[in-house]
Amino acid sequence: MKILVLSLVTSGSLVYAFILVMDPYQSELVSPSMPRAPVAQNQRYSYPALARNVGFDSAVVGTSTVRLLKPARLNTLLGARFVNLAMNDATPFEQVLMTRLFLQHHPRAKFLIFGVDDSWCRESESVRVETIRGLPEFMYDANQWNDLLYLFNDKALENSVRMLELVRGKREPKYGLDGYEDFSDDPEDRRLSLVRERIYGASAAVLPASPVNLEPARVRPGVRMAEMDQFADLLSGIPAGTRITVLFPPRHIWAMSQNPGLYQECKWRARSVVKTLRPDAVILDLLLDSAITREDSNYHDRIHYVDEVAEKVELAIARTTEKKRRGGSYWEVR
């Protein structure tokens, strides 16, 4: 029995030592120097290290609807060093956590771009804290030492093996060193028939015949949007010198036409919070009935636009930022 116990303890210690050496989430204060990069598929584990990286001075925060905003292009347009911290299906709670973590390590951040989409506009009575992907809250607090308590598990071991493969040149990073990944670049995946299947559930287009009114308006005051209650938390605590863009990213018109009043109400509420807390912020509303949102080939599915559209969004961010600097206020780009 003693031999068995000793063997188990020894094996466990070796496994834990391997995990600590590989530092799969780049979260340890002390670990051997290696050419690490994000390897965990779950961005909630991969991105805290990027949020702490002092090589950046600006960030994109949101869900997958702003994941295609490319840091390298934003850097050129805005004269900054961007990291994209947008995560698939990120709840507003997670977005607030990510923003606070970034600001802990970047108290003089130059730019913050927030994507406001269905994650904020959901009709709900309660707040979602996390998704089925799980949320390692210990990675988002100010104490990195406590991360060591949560690393002895099969997922950390799996990602340590991936990190070893990466260091040995046997694996590519899951995400770029600036958090970017283009998930829309497969030509086969962009065949129009497939795109329309993902948008409409059919191979033929079913565009709304009449224009869809998506202007911000107080049209559903009785609707409970619990997530929107956290929007003030997102904006609070951001340094006065940080330039903020609140972006309503463009989704396909078919998706928006299913419940336009909800989007109108959500945008009205978000705009009210921005005007109260950060009137210096830019509000860029692309969640509109437009040539962009009516063109099927601009989309990967009903929610996600492709890289060519992302580039147009980035240019719009740069234009509105410059207009705001010159004394503008609320800007819409159609």
Residue ranges with predicted function:
Residues V116, V129-G241, E322, Y330-R334:
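Secreted/periplasmic serine-hydrolase-like ester/acetyl group-modifying domain
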Residues G55, V61, T65-L151:
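Membrane-embedded segments
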Residues M256-S257, G261-R334:
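C-terminal regions of proteins
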Residues K2-D23:
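Hydrophobic membrane-insertion alpha-helices, especially the h-region
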Residues S236-G261:
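Active-site segments of SGNH/GDSL-like serine hydrolases
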Residues M22-R44:
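Alpha-helical transmembrane signal-anchor/signal-peptide segments
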Residues P38-T65:
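Short extracytoplasmic
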Residues V96, R224-A232, L262-V273:
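Well-ordered, non-membrane alpha-helical segments in soluble/globular domains
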